[in-house]
Amino acid sequence: MAVIFVLFFLVSMALSARIRPSFNGTALSGTSNKHPFEPGPNTIFREEVPPSAAASGFPSAHGTELRTHDPSIIKVGSIYYSYSVGPSITIHQAFSLDGPWTEVGALLSGESVIKKGDRKAPWAANTIYINGRYYCYYSVSNSGCRDSAIGVASSAFPGPGEWTDHGLIIQSGTGEGSDVFPLNQSNTIDPNVFVDGDGTAYLNFGSFWTGLWQVPLEEELVTVKGLQDGTLDAVHLAAEPGKVWRSKLANSKAKTVSTSKTGSPICGDPTGGHPIEGGFMAYHAPYYYMWFSWGRCCEFKDPAMRSNGKEYRIRVGRSTSARGPFVDKQGIDLVDGGGETVYGSNGDVFAPGGQGILTDEFGDILYYHYLNSSVSYDFADARLGYNRLEYVDGWPVAVY
């Protein structure tokens, strides 16, 4: 029987905001970015992006049957745990990344205690283990808006049933602290916590708008350091300054657009689509790596939305400090639009993103969600995939 491979070529237009119900450690000190975000002299404005999947050179994915978005995976003993969007944050477990994966319950006992956004099914969980306890950082928001918040729950066990929801640690758009820089111009979703070798913990977050940011956490890991006393030490990690697609608000004649105290729109960005999100920091000596998803994450039923070359792909920058600056191979700062593409669409792999890094006895693993183009472009059909990483001259390369 002949097997027909349908090649999808990249070139057109997409939406200006992420549409989804979902997700997603050692350092020196750096300096804070205290200025509003503006394109700099080294800013890259991308008119077109990467070659067709056929010419990508990316390896095939280790595909699985676990349907997920923005997974967070940890390994405890011989068991893998995956935390992802779903009622009260869904937990799956398996004895192999390849599966089979079994749903074992929910992380929270009900809705998030944060009274914002989609409380019933928080997005982008990021689970870590430190000091004998598991911490799961999560987001609540609404699609296309930055009226968002990040919360945290903790437990002595990785499975369901024993978690305490500590609630809000940081928010943007509306609410206490949302008028503090850079929360007054960013989107507090897609949390990722990186713990330094000296025990210092950093919260990385951000989606669209002004990109990815970092703030330090207190030692107890459930409070942002300096937020209450005006000494917040925020660092700008990465951004997409170029208008990758036109905003729906650009020609809007609507008389009212919800804005923050600084005038920054809360729902929709009239400056256009700046598709960068899903930051994940990892360390592989001697560098710190800032991974992120670039492009459109979801809703590809319309062929025009999947043929324009602006779908998700996984990019990275590196630094000698967890506080940056992070640069790509050309030395371009991620804040100026830099970023090295490590994995993207190829074969039946479409729009990989929402990534994380897992380290086992054999090395580093890049895991992510993706759409299998031979099966479906439906949002609900996104599934877990992964690839091993090799490092060439200090730069990660995806291999099968």
From Swiss-Prot:
Keywords: Carbohydrate metabolism, Glycoprotein, Glycosidase, Hydrolase, Polysaccharide degradation, Secreted, Signal, Xylan degradation
Record's subcellular location: Secreted
Residues of the signal peptide: 1-16
Catalysed reactions, as listed in the record: Endohydrolysis of (1->5)-alpha-arabinofuranosidic linkages in (1->5)-arabinans
GO molecular function, one term: arabinan endo-1,5-alpha-L-arabinosidase activity
Family: Belongs to the glycosyl hydrolase 43 family.
Listed name of the protein: Arabinan endo-1,5-alpha-L-arabinosidase B
